[in-house]
Amino acid sequence: IDDAAILIKINKELFQHGIFSSITVRVSEGRVLLTGTVDSPDKRLKAERVAWQQSEVKEVVNEIAVDKDEVTLKEVAIDSAISAQIKARMVAHAGIKSVNYSINTVGGVVYLMGIAQSQKELNSVIGISKRVKGVKQVISYVRLKHSKLRR
């Protein structure tokens, strides 16, 4: 499965539908995580349909929030800073292969996706994430390296 190709196709379609800027897409082993905020349920559903249209997609997790109020630049900056702090702490932690994870934060909610080498590593990643200032919740879509779910 070519995750990069899936990502490019989904982003291209989202751009064509005018919803690219408000949605973040992460892909891991054909599993797609959609996050962000849109102003209508129709746009949320459209993004999910776009993801499912890609032939190699195995699963779509739609965490897109519907909110009529536009997200401010300050809120985006705070969320980006949270993700950056988590990534930096993961890189500094000897027991974590940080390259195997993607992190996205929306409204203080941290979404983790990727492959953990072990339950211990995953617990460390979740713990690091929870300790960053501004984090309200951590939602993990991480799979363990040897999980039967990966096959």
Swiss-Prot record:
Domain BON: 2-68, 78-146
Pfam families hit by this protein: BON
Highest taxon above the source species: Bacteria
Cross-referenced SMART domains: BON (SM00749)
Keyword terms, alphabetized: Repeat
Keyword Zinc attached: no
PROSITE patterns in the cross-refs: BON
Protein name, per record: Uncharacterized protein in gshII 5'region
Provenance organism: Anaplasma centrale
